[in-house]
Regions:
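Substrate-binding pocket helix/loop in short-chain dehydrogenase/reductase
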Residues: 100-101, 105-113, 218
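Active-site helix of classical SDR
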Residues: 124, 160, 168
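Short C-terminal tail/terminal secondary-structure segment
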Residues: 2, 149, 237-238, 249-263
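Conserved glycine-rich cofactor-binding loop
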Residues: 9, 16-17
């Protein structure tokens, strides 16, 4: 299916791995010009190489700490200077940080909010003047179902993800007059670098518990009976960014194999 993304300009934060990289690949395959941002330049370079080799379309990798507003401003400027505008912003950067209240430090809380909330605010704030000039502008925030139905011991992530969902709804109304659509995808259990790292920290040298065993254990709570692949989330992001989803705004869409108890 041609989604109508040919020539569109997209910025994806947290784009060097996992869901962000998958979304970048999907958009690039559809003909979009994609800039991916992350902190680790070596991982960015590898992602750019991987995507370019598969699509032969322009891809930028820009090292950016989205917790720093000046760095985000520079990211936006570099993309605009290179390609002339912005049509799509995907606020994807973030990691899982979970704790019970009695164990959570103020530093942990602050760090999570800076990354997931301030990062999205900075990106949207500085991309907005250019998104207003686009004829098909889209903002997509990635959150989790836990932002709608948090479990015990999942703060501060539950707080920051709920904020992301709230910002999505607020911005969808605030920016509608400029024909800017804003949606969020709520990501469930997806095979990602974060989960691989979690397995490696405790089981990499344990031959009795492989990474596949880890995925199988995680899948037991998922109604579809498996852990999702990054490209399954990336393809949904790509669709939401396209004109094929032109009447979808203010939505929060679960990509979780049916795990969440809420819609």
């Amino acid at each position: 299916m041609k989604l109508g993304l040919e020539g569109k300009i997209a910025i994806i934060t947290g784009g060097s791995d996992g869901i962000g990289k998958a979304a970048a690949l999907s958009m690039s395959q559809e003909g979009a010009r994609v800039a991916i941002a992350a902190r680790d330049q070596s991982r960015l370079d590898k992602a750019v190489s991987d995507i370019s080799a598969q699509t032969h379309n322009p891809v930028l990798g820009i090292s950016t700490d989205i917790r720093n507003e000046d760095a985000v401003r520079s990211l936006i400027s570099q993309v605009v200077n290179q390609w002339g505008g912005i049509d799509i912003l995907v606020n994807n950067a973030g990691t899982s940080s979970t704790s019970r209240l009695e164990d959570m430090s103020n530093e942990q809380l602050t760090a999570d909010i800076e990354l997931k909330v301030y990062g999205a605010v900075y990106g949207t704030r500085h991309a907005l003047p250019y998104l207003k000039k686009s004829d098909s502008a889209v903002i997509i925030n990635t959150t989790t179902p836990g932002g709608k139905a948090p479990a015990a011991g999942t703060q501060p992530t539950a707080l920051s993800r709920a904020a992301g969902i709230s910002l999505t709804k607020t911005w969808s109304k605030e920016f509608a007059e400029f024909n800017i659509r804003v949606n969020t995808i709520c990501i469930g259990l997806i095979k990602s670098g974060q989960h691989r790292a979690s397995w490696a920290r405790t089981h990499e040298e344990d031959s009795s518990y492989s990474l596949e065993d880890h995925w199988h254990k995680m899948s037991q709570v998922v109604p579809l009976g498996r852990v999702g692949e990054a490209d399954e989330a990336g393809d949904v992001i790509c669709f939401l960014a396209s004109p094929k989803a032109s009447y979808v705004t203010g939505a929060s869409i679960n990509i979780d194999g049916g795990l969440s108890p809420v819609v």
